[in-house]
Amino acid sequence: MSNTETDRLLDFPDTAAQPLLGNVRAAAELLECLTVDRALLEQLPADHRERLHRAVAKFYHPDKIARRQRLKAAEREVTAAQTERADAALNGTGIRTLRRKPVFTTPNVFPPPDFDSRAAEPQDAASAELLHCYVCKQKFQIIHHFYDQMCPECATFNFSKRTELADLTGRVALLTGGRVKIGYQAGLKLLRTGARLIVTTRFPRDSAQRYAAEADFSEWGHRLEIFGLDMRHTPSVEAFCRQLVSTLPRLDFIINNACQTVRRPPDFYTHMMEGERAALEHMPAEIRKLLCAYEEPRGEVLQRTGLQARPQTRAAELSQVPLIAEDLLGGNHLFPEGRLDQDLQQVDLRGRNSWRLLMDEVSSVELLEVQLINAVAPFIINARLKPLMMRTPERDKHIVNVSAVEGQFYRNCKTTRHPHTNMAKAALNMMTRTAATDYQGDGIHMNSVDTGWVTDEDPVEIAARKTAEQRFHPPLDIVDGAARILDPIISGINTGEHVWGQFLKDYRPTDW
């Protein structure tokens, strides 16, 4: 190697490294001279000569342990660089951008009049590593502009489903659990299709405020009614069904979305209670209108019985009743005041929750609650409201029982955790499997639908560690979950093909 080449290779701009570079240049020049004339070594004292030989030998051919350590360090550097580049591409996708926002922003389905779709056309990216598609399970390298875990074909299809609508003008839909997350997004989608919507939730006033805050609320707010209902109280569910049968002219769609996966103690809900207990007349007029059908009978009961209102008129209050010992162990250290998550729900800092429980750790109370909410209440609603659904002659009605793959029997990877929620979803699936044929004969198409992997249900600390150490991110968001549970209705109306008696995952039938 010539001095010119050496200078070029050692020409680094870092001035702090200049002394080291000078030593390296001198060492390189010495070795080059000795290579030309080895007799020069004989001029050195023997101990210096041996020292030089040992240093050159160790540098050129280190021992096995040092060599292995150097190779592993180099591999780690290469892997870290590749991971950094891959994460940069994945972090640029739309789904991760939405997830980083302090508050989840509902996508604007209807673009403004001056919107230029060509100018805003997002670009796909390429990954240096092979990725695994969440839907079709195939390997891919082209990263969709929105999804970080789908191949281009699956991503394009799923992205189109997020904003797909149908004309449901004049139709009436019942949606349980429509206050937050998937239920809330499903509610917005139904309202934007033109349907009249009845929403149930334990916290009707909080729910009303959320819907009223939407930019296009004035376009559909008059078609929305919100009822307070705690699905754990079966007489309340029965009373609610009787009220709908006696007051509604028709019912076209039922979406049984309300469920309990992770049980929360009373302190989780405390921050909403002031609003739920406040006098209705102090609330804005647009919110009062959403609650009239619920608040008027509630007011009559309160007036007749004083403070001892029936459970069906005090859904929010039931959330504050401690039922197990853990319900008394809350506090600001577990549920810090004022700290809300991306869905504007209370942050839960417990180190362990229902998602981590083994069978012998599940309380009888939680076991019964999960069955009542996830299986018994949908059974009652579907049964008691069938006459109302048959009141009009159309044969394109739908019942969606929102389920999960945890309720599948034909699933290879079944964990030992949360057996009680698995049982409830399996029971819900069996109801669909059994009753769908009967209901289809009356023009009512019943299906179970998996929402997809939208949320990491683990405690906050464990979920954060999985993201940092395993690079884990849920492959879908709540808009995807809503699109999935409403697809039997929207796709059926748009195509005229109404599926029934199926367990649907990723918009297609799957094993029970």
Model regions and ranges:
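Amphipathic alpha-helical dimer-interface segment in Rossmann-like NAD(P)H-dependent oxidoreductases
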Residues: 64, 74-75, 81-111, 137-141, ...
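Conserved glycine-rich Rossmann-like NAD(P)H-binding loop of the short-chain dehydrogenase/reductase
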Residues: 193-211, 225, 253-258, 263-291
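A glycine-rich helix->loop->beta "capping" turn
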Residues: 124, 221-225, 243-256, 268
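C-terminal helical subdomain
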Residues: 299-337, 465-512
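Canonical Rossmann dinucleotide-binding motif of NAD(H)/NADP(H)-dependent dehydrogenases/reductases
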Residues: 159-204
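Conserved Rossmann-fold SDR core element
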Residues: 223, 250, 436-451, 496-503
